[in-house]
């Protein structure tokens, strides 16, 4: 780990974050900032049933391995009004899907470690590099506090830019406008 030679077996990830309640002395303002990075091949294994995945999903992080991401979250409430915002900016290394390069670049936890691209010189984001941006904004009104019934509207923007088409993915931009009525009748999560 300390030689910095990019050995494929140096499998680790890092997470740094900060949560702030009553940020800037503003009542009911919650801020969160987070940085995550995971080296290539971290959750994969040469015995496929020993990887860090289940039900065709990576367990440790949605992006698997071979990525860096920064996350910012803001929640604010004033009386019965609320606003939530979330921004995710990241870079992820995928395998190539053109059929000419069948090596694993370390991002797919279900790929065999023995198919790695190199023993040394592996870096986060190697392979088919994709830039990812996700922005989400939601505004709403708490209609009934007893049942947590909320009227809300939201805007979500996602941008995915791989250098080349990835397995099942190509470059895309999507924007969603949402609105609705929701309730958290069975919200029993109070670990904060």
Regions found by a protein language model. Name each.
Residues 1-192:
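Exposed, low-structure sequence patches enriched in small/polar residues
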């Amino acid at each position: 780990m300390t030689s910095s030679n990019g050995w494929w077996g140096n499998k680790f990830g890092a997470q740094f974050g900060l949560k702030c309640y009553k940020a800037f002395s503003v009542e009911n303002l919650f801020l969160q900032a987070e940085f995550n990075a995971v080296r290539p091949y971290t959750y994969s294994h040469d015995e496929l049933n020993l990887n860090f995945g289940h039900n065709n999903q990576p367990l440790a992080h949605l992006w698997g391995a071979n990525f860096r991401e920064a996350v910012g979250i803001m929640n604010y409430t004033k009386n019965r009004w609320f606003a939530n915002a979330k921004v995710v900016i990241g870079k992820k290394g995928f395998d190539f899907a053109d059929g000419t390069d069948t090596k694993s670049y370390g991002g797919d936890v279900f790929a065999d470690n023995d198919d790695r691209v190199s023993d040394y010189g592996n870096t986060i984001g190697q392979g088919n590099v994709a830039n990812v941006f996700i922005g989400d904004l939601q505004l709403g009104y708490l209609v009934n506090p007893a049942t947590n019934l909320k009227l809300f509207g939201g805007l979500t923007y996602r941008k995915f830019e791989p250098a080349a088409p990835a397995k099942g993915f190509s470059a895309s931009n999507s924007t969603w406008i949402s609105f609705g009525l929701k309730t958290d009748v069975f919200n029993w999560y109070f670990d904060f």
